[in-house]
Each structure stands twice: as structure tokens, then as C-alpha cells.
Amino acid sequence: MTYECLQQYWWFLVSLLGALLVFLMFVQGANSMIFSLGSNEVERRLIVNSTGRKWEFTFTTLVTFGGAFFASFPLFYSTSFGGAYWLWMIILFSFVLQAVSYEFQNKLGNLLGARTFQRCLVLNGILGPLLLGGAVATFFNGSNFIVAKDNMVDGFELQPVISSWANASHGLDALLDPWNLVLGFAVFFLARILGILYVMNNVNDENIRCRGSVRLVGTSVPFVVLFVAFLVHVVLKDGYAYDPVSGIISIVPMKYLDNLLTLWWVAVVLLVGVVLVLYGIIRTIVSKTYIGGIWPAGIGTVLTVLALLLTAGLNNTAYYPSNADLQSSLTIANSCSSEFTLSVMAVVSILVPFVLAYIVYAWYSIDKKKLDKEELSTGEAY
């Protein structure tokens, strides 16, 4: 496998992890609606225990996503995670707060009360998807950073800082771009949609299911409007292309539309993903008995996000544009690890299907029985 193929292969794997992370944020979506889907303490505990079965999947995928980026594209890791640290610290803090809230809300000696920790889960359910969506949007809209490539390691002499943020906001400036917020809120509403569909499928309670069906309508409308608006914005906006020979980066009109036309199979994946998400939503709204909407909508989410991330990084495109210095923009060619590192990791990645198979098996084992009120009396309940 050539160096170029390895770069594309690892961009695909990182994109797949990112897509799975967005799907698994149904945990955050459901948690953001604890007080909306649950009308009393028992129903709220049902929702918390339902998402409590899966929150570790989301947290682990978030960490794995960051680790895969660090290993395969270390310059992005140091630039974004090291430069935009306020944005990423808030995201990580909200996820840590989630873990603490699950474990301590009903413990003996909890002086704050269960409702306080439930509100913390709601906070994570809002901030997590919103900020992650905004961070992903910077792949298309750019960020304010500078990469001093002359400061790379020169022989055995270590040079000063390679990448730095161009202002004192350290990532919070991403929230000042309206289009970053558009995708951020689109991901937030998508997480809520997936959360509703998951709870309807996982919790055996008619009151929660009926309430979820109603909430699904009010959540789907803003999601569709925001997502379509962002998609139109992306395909019509100027993109950032790089010359594979010289590495020079230039602005190209409607670059992302060209990517979808050139990489036609990515466009097909995007279309199939969108159709599956809409199918899962519409069928759940129309049918009174259908509770399996999480599966077509979940698979559609993975395909849609995967296609968007592939569009951002393939076909000689700068996946992390710099608004401060165009030539500092990051590509899969100038930000990746060495050929040896990518080759070794590619061999190890053969084990990924086995890990995914184990996750599917664990998921099936956990969900073999639908959650009901009887399980709240067990010692393992949150």
C-alpha cells in the first residue's frame, strides 16, 4: 500500500469513528430530554437507566476518536486539541460530568439530590452535541491557527512551537461563526431525534413512547431545516484545495460540490444516509406501533457523517483550513504520521472488525430484554 493510500485509509477510519460518535450521541440526546420525556421520577429514572446502559460506548468512542487522530494525523491533534483547548476542555468536562452524574445520583450520602445530577446529564446532553457539531463545522469553515512548518524537528535539534492559535480565544471563536452554530444545532437536534428513537425502542413504557412520538415531530423540523441549510452552504461555498506535488493550498470555488461529483460514491453514501434518517423519523411518526426507528436513522447518521467527513478530506482537499494563514491549512498529506507508523497501525487495524463484532454482541446482550419499571428495584439501577 502506497503512502498516499495509507493516508486515505486512515482518514476513512478516523471519519468512521467520528460518524459512529455522532450516532452514539443518542445518549446525550435522550439525556437532554429527561424532564421532557419523563413526567415523574419513575419515568425519568427509566430514561436515565436506559441511556446508562450505553453511555460508556459513547465515552469510549470519543476517546478512541481523539486517539486515532493523534496517532494518524498528529499535527491536527497538536493544532486543534492543543490550540483550541478551551473548546475541547468544555466538551471533555461535560462528558466527565456525565460519568460522575450516572454513578452518584442515587448513591447513599448524595447531599445534592438525584435531580441535581439529572440536570448535569441534561447539561452534557446540550453542550456535548452542540460543541462537537461546531468543532466538526470548522473542517469546512476553517479556524484561526498558524503552523510554522520551519519549526519542525531539524535533525536532532528541537525547534520552538510548531502550531499556535492566532488569538486568545483558543477555540471559542468557532462559536462566533454562524455556520458553525448551524451545524452545531443540527447535530444537537439530531442527537435528540436519535435519543427519542432509542428510548422508544429500549424502554417498555407506553407513556414515554407516546410522549416521544409527539416530541419527535417538534425536534425533526428544526433539524431538517438546519441540516439542509448547512449542506447547501457547503456545496456552494469556496473550498480549500492543495497541489499534491508542491503542497501549495489555494481557494477553489465550490470545491466541496466538485468533491461530491468526482467522488460519486461518496455522494451516493450521503444520499442513502439522508434517506435512511428520514425514513426512521417519518415511519416512527406515522406508525403507532413501530419502535425500530433508531436502526435506520442510526445507520443513516453514520453514513451521512462519514460522507461529509470524506468530502472534507479527500480529493486533494484541506480538511482543516486556516483562516489566519491559508498555507497553514492542514491536509491528510502534510499532517499525517510517517509511512512506517501508518503501515504498522494499518496492520493492527485488521482487528477493528472483531472489536466491532464484540460491541454488537455486547449491545445485543444488554438489550435482550426491554427496560421496565421492575428493573429499577435492582441494585444495579442508576
Indicate where each model-derived feature is located.
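Membrane-interfacial helix termini and the short, flexible loops that connect transmembrane helices
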Residues: A30-R44, F73-Y77, A99-C120, V199-G212, ...
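Transmembrane-helix bundle segments that line or gate the permeation/cavity pathway
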Residues: L24-S32, G52, T60-L108, N124-D154, ...
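Juxtamembrane helix-loop boundaries in multi-pass membrane proteins
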Residues: E43-V63, W88, A114-G128, E157, ...
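Alpha-helical transmembrane segments
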Residues: Q8-V22, G82-F95, I126, A174-L190, ...
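Long, contiguous internal "core" modules enriched in hydrophobic/ aromatic residues
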Residues: L108-Y290
